[in-house]
Regions:
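Secretory/extracellular carbohydrate-interaction modules
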Residues: 1-122
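Intrinsically disordered, low-complexity segments enriched in small/polar residues
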Residues: 98-99, 114, 130, 156, ...
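Beta-strand secondary-structure signal
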Residues: 45-49, 157-159, 168
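Aromatic sugar-binding interfaces of carbohydrate-active proteins
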Residues: 148, 161-226
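Generic structural motif
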Residues: 112-116, 160, 169
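Surface-exposed coil/turn segments at beta-strand junctions on protein surfaces, enriched
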Residues: 39-41, 149-153, 162
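A signal for specific C-terminal beta-sheet/loop modules enriched in small/flexible residues
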Residues: 2-22, 131-139, 143-145, 178-206
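Short, aromatic/His-centered strand-loop micro-motif at the edge of beta-sheets
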Residues: 107, 115-157, 178
């Protein structure tokens, strides 16, 4: 199972009332969303400074990319039947951002990276996460990052700013280079500047979006047999 502790972004009106999760008034939108005036905000900002003290060391599926990792922040699209169809990813609850820390049990340090999920229907085989390294490499690399990585208990920070249609990401840590990325969330150009033909051409343009500060452990533990 994936154990988790999350703080979900919610909005309140001028009287302190929290709108329904079925209302755009409890989500933010990209600037190019055709109904952007119905949302609580255009764009969003999320910042955190944190330390990861523990990750799973006993993963049943140790060869799977999420093993030995923890999600420490994300932006999520809402799961909404009215938006959902078999052509686009709108309404399927995909994630334009998941920030990971991953450390193998025998490694000195761990890696920090972020993933962008192609915005496609749930049963589309092309729907996958694209990893972008921050310190160390992405989740497919099992080499020890050594001094380039982040140790357990070592502090690092991230700042995520969705402005207009673009998501700006800044990662910083003492004795490590500051790393910046950006990606337009309303087209299918990836964070390296290349067109991704598998992604929806307008990416997350029409989705209802919200942020999460999270600690989600991505490992299925091997349970003892009796």
């Amino acid at each position: 199972t994936n154990t988790r502790s999350e703080l979900r972004q919610v909005y309140a009106d001028e009287n302190g009332n929290v709108p329904s999760l079925e209302s755009p008034a409890n989500y933010f939108a990209l600037a190019s969303n055709p109904d952007s005036d119905k949302f609580a905000a255009i764009g969003a900002r999320m910042e955190a400074t944190l330390k990861v003290d523990h990750v799973s060391t006993n993963a049943k599926y140790h060869d799977k990319p999420p093993a030995y990792s923890v999600v420490v922040g994300q932006i999520h699209a809402g799961k909404l039947d009215d938006l959902r169809n078999d052509v686009s990813g709108f309404g399927w609850g995909n994630e334009p951002l998941k920030i990971y820390y991953k450390k193998y049990p025998n490694h000195e340090t761990g890696t920090v990276f972020w993933n962008y999920e192609l915005n496609l229907p749930e049963d589309n085989p092309k729907r996958t996460d694209i990893a972008y390294p921050v310190w160390g490499d992405g989740w497919h690399d099992d080499n020890d990052p050594g001094e380039t990585g982040i140790a357990l208990g070592e502090s690092f920070s991230y700042e995520i700013n969705v402005y207009g249609d673009t998501m700006y990401l800044t990662f910083s840590a003492e004795n490590h280079p500051t790393v910046k990325h950006q990606i337009n969330l309303a087209n299918n150009v990836d964070a390296n500047g290349f067109i991704d033909d598998y992604d929806d051409p307008v990416a997350y343009k029409n989705d209802w979006l919200f942020s999460k500060l999270a600690r989600i452990t991505n490992a299925v533990r091997r349970m003892p047999q009796h």
